[in-house]
Amino acid sequence: MNFLSYLISGISLGSVYALIALGYTMVYGIAKMLNFAHGDVIMIGGFVIFTAVSSMHTSAGVAIVCAIIVCTVLGVTIEKIAYKPLRNAPPLAVLITAIGVSYFLQNMALLIFGSASRNFPDILNLPDWHVAEGLTVTGEAILTIAATIVIMIALTAFINHTRIGSAMQAVSEDRGAAQLMGVNVNSTISVTFAIGSALAAV
C-alpha cells in the first residue's frame, strides 16, 4: 500500500510539473525562446489567489479565474513589451532580457507582498479518498491528476483542430514560410504566450 501511495503522490507531483512544462515548451516551440519569467508568472498567480482568498474572502473559483486573467494579461504584456522588439535579435539578447524580466517580477512581488512567509490557505477543502486499507488519496492529488489530463487533451485538440492551432504549428515549423502563407506571426506568438501564462495560473 505504501508503494501505491507513493506512486499516486508521484503522479500528482508530476502532473504539476507537466502543467509547468506545457507553458515553457509552447513558448519555446513556437517563439524559439526560453521564457525564464514563466516561473515568476506562476508566482504572481499564486499571490493573486492568496490575496483573493485571504484578504478579499472570495470563493476558490473566483480566485482561480482572477489568477488566470491576471497571468494571461501579464504574459501577453511581457511578450509585447520585452520580447516582441527582440524578434530578430541574437539569442543572447533575448536570454538576458528574459532573466531581466524574471528579476523585475521577483522584486515587484517583494515590494508589493513583502518577504514574510505565508501559509497558503486550503481553498478547495476536498475530502480524502480511502481507496483501501492503509491507502488514502487526497482530493487535491486526484483533482491535480484529472485536471492535467483534461487540460492536455483539450490543448491537443486545440492545436490539431483549430485554425489558431494550425497557425501555431506553421510558425513552429518555419516562421518565414508561415508569414508568406498569410499567418500573422506576431498574433500567433501573443496567443501562445497567453495560453502558456494561463496554464501557469492553473
Where are these regions (language model features)?
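Single transmembrane alpha-helix segments in multi-pass membrane proteins
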Residues: 3-54, 77-87, 93, 187
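Helix-loop-helix "hairpin" substructures at the membrane interface of multi-pass membrane proteins
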Residues: 13, 135-202
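Alpha-helical transmembrane segments within multi-pass membrane transporters and channels
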Residues: 24, 57-101, 108
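Alpha-helical transmembrane segments of polytopic integral membrane proteins
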Residues: 24-30, 49, 74-80, 101, ...
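Short amphipathic alpha-helical coupling elements at transmembrane boundaries
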Residues: 83-88, 122, 129, 167-180
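Transmembrane helix-bundle core of multi-pass membrane transporters
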Residues: 85-86, 91-161, 188
